[in-house]
């Protein structure tokens, strides 16, 4: 599996990103497992993103655990307030 790819404009701070991932947005204080796609203008903060997850463009994820094989559509906000939010949206799949 190829290493993670950080495209121009991506910003990753205090995060661990698994192999096969493609990062186009911002990732802070988070753990991303293998084959995670972070779309353009996405923000991921204080979250755990499991294997094979697709985050569409302009998505905001904070204080969440996103389950494996999940697709988050573009322009979506998931924010856990006061506790961790678990997100499972299995609507579409993609391959990296």
Model-derived features: positions:
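Left-handed beta-helix
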Residues: 1-96
């Amino acid at each position: 599996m190829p290493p993670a790819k950080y495209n121009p404009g991506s910003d990753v701070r205090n995060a661990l990103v698994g192999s096969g991932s493609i990062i186009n947005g911002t990732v802070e204080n988070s753990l991303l497992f293998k084959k995670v796609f972070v779309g353009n203008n996405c923000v991921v903060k204080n979250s755990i993103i499991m294997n094979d997850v697709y985050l569409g463009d302009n998505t905001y994820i904070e204080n969440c655990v996103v389950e494996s094989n999940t697709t988050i559509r573009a322009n979506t906000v998931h924010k856990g307030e006061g506790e961790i939010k678990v997100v499972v949206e299995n609507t579409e799949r993609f391959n990296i």
